[in-house]
Amino acid sequence: MNSNTHAKSSNFHQSELDKFAALANRWWDADGPQKPLHALNPVRLEYVSTRLELAGARVLDVGCGGGLLSESMARLGAQVTAIDLAPELVKVARLHSLESGVQVDYRVQSVEDLAAEQPGSFDTVTCMEMLEHVPDPTAIIRACASLLKPGGKLFLSTLNRTPAAFALAVVGAEYIARLLPKGTHHYKDFIKPAELAAWLRNAGLQLEDVSGMLYEPWRNRARLSSRTEVNYLAYAVKP
């Protein structure tokens, strides 16, 4: 399926969409190809929920994939809209939402298009493990900023561009331990926290925090950490 038929935006790599669409049917399999993501999800949720009252908040999840974080936030009372450019992933997310009885408004739509339609509409925007997979992450951040209400919060997670990240997230996870399919990540697209901070500032957002997220494959568990050499989370506020 040509995943870009449902969105105007060209800010994506078709190969990236196809790669993740191929994982759609096993997205919710905690022991499947997305096993590390299942381990990271509680940490992502903790990071968001300790900085925001999710109950009643209007939240947008950008690059929602099969809906792991979207459903988790909805379970805590958030009114969640979730978007992705891969129809296969959105279909899986919708089906799981029906099965679980958790209400999420899933859409095949780009964040840029949604920003043009509904600026200033959300209390919070989350964009997790996505920026390193698009051609122009700065455009994603600008669109996310546009979608926030004044005082709204943007939560992000991505990978640092360091030798440690290359060794662990690419070589170790994809080729040695085979925790992820080969080709999941491209080191050149990883993002240093200083770069992310500049992009947020240029989008009119104020960076409030950067925290490391440590994945322990031998336990299949993740936790927040002061170390940001590999995975890290950040949040910023719209004045």
UniProtKB/Swiss-Prot annotation:
GO-annotated biological processes: methylation
E.C. code: 2.1.1.222, 2.1.1.64
PANTHER family from the UniProt entry: METHYLTRANSFERASE, UBIQUINONE BIOSYNTHESIS O-METHYLTRANSFERASE, MITOCHONDRIAL
Annotated keywords: Methyltransferase, S-adenosyl-L-methionine, Transferase, Ubiquinone biosynthesis
Residues annotated as binding S-adenosyl-L-methionine: R44, G63, D84, M128
Pfam families: Methyltransf_23
Domain of life from the UniProt record: Bacteria
Membrane found in the keyword field: no
Function: O-methyltransferase that catalyzes the 2 O-methylation steps in the ubiquinone biosynthetic pathway.
Organism: Xanthomonas euvesicatoria pv. vesicatoria (strain 85-10)
Pathway this chain belongs to: Cofactor biosynthesis; ubiquinone biosynthesis
Name this polypeptide is given: Ubiquinone biosynthesis O-methyltransferase
GO MF: 2-polyprenyl-6-hydroxyphenol methylase activity; 3-demethylubiquinol 3-O-methyltransferase activity; polyprenyldihydroxybenzoate methyltransferase activity
Primary enzyme class: transferase
Catalytic activity: a 3-demethylubiquinol + S-adenosyl-L-methionine = a ubiquinol + S-adenosyl-L-homocysteine + H(+); a 3-(all-trans-polyprenyl)benzene-1,2-diol + S-adenosyl-L-methionine = a 2-methoxy-6-(all-trans-polyprenyl)phenol + S-adenosyl-L-homocysteine + H(+)
Transmembrane segments: none
Presence of keyword S-adenosyl-L-methionine: yes
Family, as annotated: Belongs to the methyltransferase superfamily. UbiG/COQ3 family.
